[in-house]
Amino acid sequence: MAATRSILTLSSIRSKAVIYTFLLMDKPDGGALRQRVRPEHKAYLARVAERMAFAGPLVSDDGHTMLGSLLAIDFESRDAAQTWLANEPFTVAGLYASSSVHAFVNLWPQKAGFAPAD
């Protein structure tokens, strides 16, 4: 009997919420703005904490200079993810020079965060 191979696609997991990744790069010299808006940003993130796989700043090789943010959050749709980003305090304050949002399928076992998709 020939083995059948299952191919995982975004449409095959649509019945579930999807993890969306946010790659958000700061404008040059955005450090002061980032620090000023950070309390609002953290409060906004706390509202989706139960759906968050991970979140944190992107830093330069010195380990301290913040360059942007990388987040992975579970949303029901791309529209919901985009709306969430549009209202995110760093976005509203104009911190980001660029942003991209992508659906993410976790296929690698991990010890924390979201379980891999089947």
Identify the role of each PLM range.
Residues 2-118:
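Conserved, structured core segments of small domains
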